[in-house]
């Protein structure tokens, strides 16, 4: 049974048993800063398990894309060397959210494994947590497994928790026994790490809530989280003891072998490891890029870069000196594109990003390997490579630490992890800051109970800018109150509202809340702390508002309209960027206000003027077409199937709002124009870098764009008036002005040179003799730095033999020293003289034996410095 068939059978089986099929979520977790990547099937359901979100199903089934290559789950160093370690894998899972529990979960899992997949029950054994008598009884009494096939595990291996606190519970796992021809012992034994017994199914019984003191309190509605690795099931069903021998990997291994000119069936063990590494890594690399991650030196992008460069290095071990990984994208698309259409839809982008990174690393790989060879030349087995060298390899040659460790592994040379970490401290602190928590816990303590009590806020703002409502909650200083009085700053929650709460990058509405008694609350901001709760922040201007009061809510219409224009323009610009730059472009963040729009997007280099102009032209073309904005509500799956862009980092419920403006179609809950022509005109203000692999565009449209154009036009008119020309001939006028300036500068240089020549004769009269050598150390005025240098040359020529130091004051000190050829480097060096003189005026300098330059900041010290020069020269002459 091939991998695709197993996946289809799994989903179909649980659909037949009342489970809703939920598509795989992105590898980039939404609204979870604690995770780099989605690493388990339950990640997309975390809010359901925590009780923060409700959906219209209580049973779900999914085949989830997962990556484990950083943080707690870091399988990278073992990939390719063991039978079952992967950076990318698929987790098949069935879930119950307060629906069925242990008995049905065990029964369904056992039935699917033994009946639908046809795995021999005699080959299976299970584990339970040692204190979970309920699960043990179900397995032995209801399923009918003999006691020697149910192993009690006392360790935390069979007790799962989401974190230090929160939902947790015991686990039960199903293991497949490959037989005594494969080394290894059963789970719980000393040699359990062997390959004979492989876990193919894990049932997590979430039945407790762990408090901060460790107390376990039974959950009112226990849940089920099940995980089964597709790659492991494929190995069992295809009679393989190694996942890489299944149909999920073999086409990729053979394609890589063909590129390297080796036979994967007869090659050496180390060559086979390299082929397996490449097959695994092209999967994770391609899926990560397809989900919007680009190579960088921080966060997710850095993990991607590590994986890519490890794959490239193994290609080099196979003799692949030129970029090759990008050529495997086609094979991967043919293998998995039917299930994951993003692989085929983005194949050109995937290949381009991978090849660009391959070329970038190839430029330093050879030099870096040579540096590494030199560094380990004197090391023996058991020695450790120092952290400074490791950091140099990382910082200069782009070698991630684990890549260097992987290279040294075969030589049995270790790495100085602590030393490397010390060198990396500053960079790591920056990366860690990017993954710090979001501070949502304190908000949850206030808003979750409030939402439970008052219910969802109904949003009326798509149609109305004013509405009547009831006040259902009041907040002051972070706590609920009964009333707000004049002068109080606080928050108002109503049962319904036309005010848009900030979300999806769109700022919240402003306006007023008026009460029948004349009281007035000014809304300065509107937030959406939870998906169904809208909170109006502001200040009580007059009167008092009480819980239960009837209120009239009025949005600031002019501000709302300006925000509408910019939000719709953001959609059009996002679509234009993908058309101009490529489908790898994905929104990484946005900010839409009445003043302007800002869009952060994934792209690996700065945009050219031609690209910026093309994007601007496309958006303005869509505006001129004056098409209607269309809105529809559908499931996320239906929306994506229809071609809508889902923005990763946004959380979507069971139904989503799809906004179409011309060719642009996105999942969006924001407010938009009725027709594209309402935006008037669009103008890009700036393009810049935000972080590695992320660019930022700022733009305006409508009235704001017209105001900027008007301001620019007025500035052009004013500049043209100064030059006494027309605005359309301003460039010519500036060219003429610059030409005149250049001519004047040349004339000034000639005058200064002539002046300097005249000054030289006077300076020569100030020369003195020190130890039989002529010395001229004086301050000059009225010249620039260039003239000062010319004067030193002229003095040297006329002096014949001697030492010169000229000082120029002003805002700072400029110094030039000269020594004639007969003395330079023999008895006196200009560089030494400059070091002495510059230090005395609070600066530094240096140069050749015959000429040196320098300067300082202490202008007042010039006379003292000049007085000290004869003594310095006498010391030099001895």
From Swiss-Prot:
EC nos: 6.1.1.7
GO CC entries: cytosol
Reaction(s) catalysed by this chain's protein: tRNA(Ala) + L-alanine + ATP = L-alanyl-tRNA(Ala) + AMP + diphosphate
First and last residue of the signal peptide: none
Cofactor(s) demanded: Zn(2+)
UniProt record, GO biological process: alanyl-tRNA aminoacylation; negative regulation of DNA-templated transcription
Domain topic, free-text comment: Consists of three domains; the N-terminal catalytic domain, the editing domain and the C-terminal C-Ala domain. The editing domain removes incorrectly charged amino acids, while the C-Ala domain, along with tRNA(Ala), serves as a bridge to cooperatively bring together the editing and aminoacylation centers thus stimulating deacylation of misacylated tRNAs.
Primary subcellular site in the record, as a coarse category: cytoplasm
Gene: alaS
Binding site for Zn(2+): 567, 571, 668, 672
Role this protein plays: Catalyzes the attachment of alanine to tRNA(Ala) in a two-step reaction: alanine is first activated by ATP to form Ala-AMP and then transferred to the acceptor end of tRNA(Ala). Also edits incorrectly charged Ser-tRNA(Ala) and Gly-tRNA(Ala) via its editing domain.
Protein name: Alanine--tRNA ligase
One term of GO molecular function: alanine-tRNA ligase activity
UniProt organism field: Magnetococcus marinus (strain ATCC BAA-1437 / JCM 17883 / MC-1)
Co-factor remark: Binds 1 zinc ion per subunit.
UniProt keywords, alphabetically: Aminoacyl-tRNA synthetase, ATP-binding, Cytoplasm, Ligase, Metal-binding, Nucleotide-binding, Protein biosynthesis, RNA-binding, tRNA-binding, Zinc
Family to which the UniProt record says this protein belongs: Belongs to the class-II aminoacyl-tRNA synthetase family.
Keyword ATP-binding included in the entry's annotation: yes
Pfam families to which the protein is assigned, alphabetical: DHHA1 (PF02272), tRNA-synt_2c (PF01411), tRNA_SAD (PF07973)
CDD domains hit by this protein: AlaRS_core
Subcellular location field: Cytoplasm
PANTHER family: ALANINE--TRNA LIGASE, CYTOPLASMIC, ALANYL-TRNA SYNTHETASE
């Amino acid at each position: 049974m091939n991998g695709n068939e197993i996946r289809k059978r799994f989903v179909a089986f649980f659909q037949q048993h009342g489970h809703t099929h939920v598509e795989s979520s992105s590898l980039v977790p939404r609204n979870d800063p604690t995770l780099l990547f989605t690493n388990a099937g339950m990640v997309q359901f975390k809010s359901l398990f925590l009780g923060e979100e409700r959906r219209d199903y209580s049973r779900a089934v999914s085949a989830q894309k997962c990556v484990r290559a950083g943080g707690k789950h870091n399988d990278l160093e073992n990939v390719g060397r063991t039978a079952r370690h992967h950076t990318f894998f698929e987790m098949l899972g069935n879930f119950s959210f307060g629906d069925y529990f242990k008995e049905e979960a065990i029964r369904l899992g056992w039935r699917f494994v033994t009946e639908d997949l046809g795995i021999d029950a005699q080959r299976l054994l299970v584990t339970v947590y040692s204190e979970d008598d309920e699960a043990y009884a179900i397995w032995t009494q209801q399923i009918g497994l003999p006691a020697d096939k149910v192993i009690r595990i006392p360790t935390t291996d069979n007790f799962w928790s989401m974190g230090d606190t929160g939902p947790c519970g015991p686990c039960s796992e199903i293991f497949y026994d490959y037989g005594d021809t494969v080394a290894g012992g059963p789970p719980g034994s000393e040699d359990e790490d062997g390959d004979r017994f492989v876990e193919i199914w894990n049932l997590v019984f979430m039945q407790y809530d762990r408090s901060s003191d460790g107390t376990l309190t039974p959950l009112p509605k226990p849940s089920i989280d099940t995980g089964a690795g597709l790659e492991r099931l494929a190995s069992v069903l295809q009679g393989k003891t190694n996942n890489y021998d299944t149909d999920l990997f073999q086409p990729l291994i053979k394609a890589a072998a063909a590129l390297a000119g080796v036979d994967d069936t007869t090659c050496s063990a180390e060559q086979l490891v390299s082929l397996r590494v490449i097959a695994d890594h092209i999967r994770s690399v391609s899926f990560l890029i397809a989900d919007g991650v680009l190579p960088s030196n921080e966060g997710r992008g850095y993990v991607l870069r590590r994986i890519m460069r490890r794959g490239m290095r193994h290609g080099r071990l196979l003799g692949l000196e030129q970029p090759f990984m990008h050529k495997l994208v086609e094979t991967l698309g043919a293998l998995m594109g039917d299930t994951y259409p993003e692989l085929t839809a983005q194949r050109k982008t995937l290949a381009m990003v991978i090849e660009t990174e391959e070329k970038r690393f190839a430029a330093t790989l050879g030099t870096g390997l040579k540096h590494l060879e030199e560094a380990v030349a004197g090391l023996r087995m058991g020695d450790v490579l120092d952290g400074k060298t490791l950091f140099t390899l990382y910082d200069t040659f782009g070698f991630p630490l684990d890549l260097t460790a992987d290279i040294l592994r075969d030589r049995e040379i270790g790495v100085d992890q602590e030393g490397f970490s010390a060198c990396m401290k500053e960079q790591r602190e920056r990366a860690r800051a990017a993954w710090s928590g979001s501070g949502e816990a304190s908000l949850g303590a206030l808003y979750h109970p409030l939402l439970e009590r008052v219910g969802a806020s109904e949003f009326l703002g798509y149609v109305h800018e004013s509405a009547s409502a009831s006040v259902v909650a009041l907040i002051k200083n972070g706590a609920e109150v009964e009333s707000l009085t004049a002068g109080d700053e606080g928050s108002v929650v109503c049962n319904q509202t036309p005010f848009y709460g900030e979300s999806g990058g769109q700022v919240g509405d402003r306006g007023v809340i008026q009460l029948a008694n004349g009281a007035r609350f000014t809304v300065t901001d509107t937030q959406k702390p939870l998906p169904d709760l809208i909170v109006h922040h502001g200040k009580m201007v007059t009167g008092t508002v009480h819980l239960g009061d009837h209120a009239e809510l009025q949005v600031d219409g002019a501000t709302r309209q300006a925000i509408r224009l910019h939000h719709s323009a953001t959609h059009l610009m996002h679509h234009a960027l993908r058309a101009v730059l490529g489908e790898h472009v994905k929104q990484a963040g946005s900010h839409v206000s009445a003043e302007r729009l800002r869009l952060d997007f994934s792209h690996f280099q700065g945009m050219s003027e031609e690209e910026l102009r093309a994007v601007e032209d496309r958006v303005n073309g869509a505006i001129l077409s004056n098409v209607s904005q269309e809105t529809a509500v559908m499931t996320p799956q239906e929306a994506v199937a229809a071609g809508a862009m889902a923005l990763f980092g946004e959380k979507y419920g069971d139904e989503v709002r799809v906004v179409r403006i011309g060719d642009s179609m996105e999942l969006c809950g924001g407010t938009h124009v009725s027709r594209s022509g309402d935006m008037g005109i669009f103008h890009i203000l700036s393009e810049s870098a935000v972080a590695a692999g992320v660019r930022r565009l700022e733009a305006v449209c409508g009235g704001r764009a017209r105001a900027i154009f008007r301001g620019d036009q007025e500035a052009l008119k004013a500049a043209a008036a100064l030059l006494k020309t027309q605005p359309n001939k301003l460039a010519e006028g500036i060219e003429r002005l610059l030409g005149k300036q250049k001519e004047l500068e040349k004339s000034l240089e000639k005058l200064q040179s002539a002046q300097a020549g005249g000054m030289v004769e006077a300076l020569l009269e100030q020369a003195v003799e020190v130890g039989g050598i002529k010395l001229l150390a004086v301050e000059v005025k009225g010249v620039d730095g260039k003239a000062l240098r010319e004067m030193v040359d002229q003095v040297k020529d006329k002096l014949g033999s001697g030492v010169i130091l000229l000082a120029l004051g002003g805002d700072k000190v400029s110094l030039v020293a000269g020594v004639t050829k007969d003395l330079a480097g023999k008895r006196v060096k200009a560089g030494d003289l400059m070091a002495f003189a510059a230090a005395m005026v609070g600066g530094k300098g240096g140069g050749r034996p015959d000429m040196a330059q320098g300067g300082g900041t202490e202008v007042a010290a010039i006379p003292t410095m000049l007085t000290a020069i004869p003594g310095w020269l006498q010391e030099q002459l001895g």
